[in-house]
């Protein structure tokens, strides 16, 4: 992937996303977010509109009857590196506004286009293989994407099963690219046609994640497909040569933990953009005979990643094993509250690991699916999603909240 393309991806596209208890500022491209106080959100709106510290400070003085000079405002914003960047031109652009004050609407969604898969991985969290009895059609998925885009979703992941197995995949990825800032396709890397690679290269905002779970024999054995490693690595190379960002994901277990450095080297040579390793989770098919990774194996992986970062870090972004859960792939994904997983049958869950639904994407409104009451109930009852139970909401602190409560007074 060329550095020019990386630069294009790094240009911010800022938005303020409102929630019942507050606001977050999001870069809709990187999907990193920063939670704002009500005061911070108001200042962000003002700076984005007039692009001037002096004007913003004076507007604040007149509206709030509170002493505020440009120097005082600059000092206040300089207390944090992110808000300090506001004083240096970060907000010299329109701010997109999305969200709801009544419900928790997502900024990112994963669409399981089908549960069908052409592999039979022993650790598949979705137990993929056969499609569900009543899966959404391509036409219905287009309606879903239009609904999500209309409610401010910026980031979409198309997954499966194997996402490419749905009839109309090319049409769906074009629709997704047209409606959303980022599109991520999760694939096993098999059966990619040249025209599909070309299509994604023209779209310009699509990345592909491909799973590589060891070297030749190990990968093929774990995924139940002879020759799968070679074909998937060739796909990574073709996508990278077409300037499509490729993320390689490796699911670690005892049988492949000693092959991490070799896989990283293969990925660097194939032109991949990012490599990340994740632990096998006790869900789906992996529950049968599941054994958590021993500390010795974890340390082995960490050592290999450090060495690989030293060797290949100038060519490949290698995500730190210790911080994998807070990396770019999950940092913004507060399950249920900022991110939804939509199963192939249309039911919405907080993440791909959880079976309990919040509602149905075509039968229920977005407001009902994201209602605080439903989320609180699922937060208490979730069986597999460990993250949602750890979410602690702050006291409500919304922009213009004081004006609403106090009323407008002269």
UniProtKB/Swiss-Prot annotation:
Keywords: 4Fe-4S, Antibiotic biosynthesis, Bacteriocin biosynthesis, Cytoplasm, Iron, Iron-sulfur, Metal-binding, Oxidoreductase, S-adenosyl-L-methionine
Name of one Pfam family that matches: SPASM
Phenotype seen when the gene is deleted: When the skfA-skfB-skfC-skfE-skfF-skfG-skfH operon is deleted, increased rate of spore formation; a double operon deletion (sdpA-sdpC plus skfA-skfH) makes spores even faster.
Residue span(s) of domain Radical SAM core: 103-314
Cofactor(s) needed: [4Fe-4S] cluster
UniProt-recorded Gene Ontology molecular function terms: 4 iron, 4 sulfur cluster binding; metal ion binding; oxidoreductase activity
Cellular compartment(s): Cytoplasm
Chief location bin: cytoplasm
Cross-referenced PANTHER family: PQQA PEPTIDE CYCLASE, RADICAL SAM DOMAIN PROTEIN
Protein name in UniProt: Sporulation killing factor maturation protein SkfB
Source organism of this protein record: Bacillus subtilis (strain 168)
Highest classification ranks of the organism: Bacteria, Bacillati, Bacillota, Bacilli, Bacillales
Gene that encodes it: skfB
